[in-house]
Amino acid sequence: MGRWHRTGLLLLATVFSSSAWALEFRSILSDRTVMYDTPSLRGKKLYLASRYYPVEVIVSLEHFAKVRDVAGELAWVEKKRLSEKRMVLVNVSLADVRQAADENAALVFQAERNVALELLEYTNTGWLKVRHPDGATGFVRISQVWGT
């Protein structure tokens, strides 16, 4: 096998392995979205999900997506019920949202466990810029939310 052939194969393997590990998150588009045990409207209805609830897409079919929620539970949902809007869910008792991506920055607001926040921007500092449903924006530690 030639040197360039091996290099090309290594490059392809790297590209495909890194993209295979990329996480795809979406949020639920509307309140009372039915989550199913199979990719069919005839499947067993497992629970209802609320608007903005973040989910991780595991499998994507033509009309359905298999998703994982914050608890690790798997379910199927109609793809048309998913939004591109990125949301994160507070996974600690009380998350501090600050004016800047700094522990010493002024506190803008606090969000309780299970509050959904819109993800506005990633930083490379361990913080995310988020927006509360009431419109307030700030930075939250990535360790205090799920959905990234």
Regions found by a protein language model. Name each.
Residues 1-9:
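Bacterial N-terminal signal peptides that target proteins for export
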Residues 20-37, 45-51, 58-136, 140-148:
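SH3-family beta-barrel domains
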Residues 8-17:
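Bacterial N-terminal signal peptides
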